[in-house]
Amino acid sequence: MVSNHARNEIEDHLGHVPSWIDSLAEPASDHSWGLVRDLEFGETELTAREKALIGVGVAAAIKCPYCTDFHKAEARMEDVTDEELAEAVNLASNTQYFSTVLHGSEVDIEEFTAETAEIVEYIENQRAAPAGAD
């Protein structure tokens, strides 16, 4: 159970203390709230909009209805469109698909990493080249 101090913070941030807060186990309950407070609601390198889109994609990938509901509501508060939500979910799906293929095929990680570096270098060079310079 979270401390009284954390309960007061939660109420200040969310308007009330949601029932799921009592599911947080000791001794990490206050810390768990701190993660939500600092990562979800705090000022970080990512905007609230970016966090919401990432959250929707991850929630879909891990098939969590709780997370999906929360992050979609969060995204709506940031004026994320249906099209952007669909794209975030499709990107997460794409990552999950290729992860399954790569793991199931036991692709060599060192070879994959080297090939990825080559691909990135090629794309960066293409982007840096003046238009029409082939």
Predicted regions span which residues?
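Hydrophobic alpha-helical segments
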Residues: 1-134
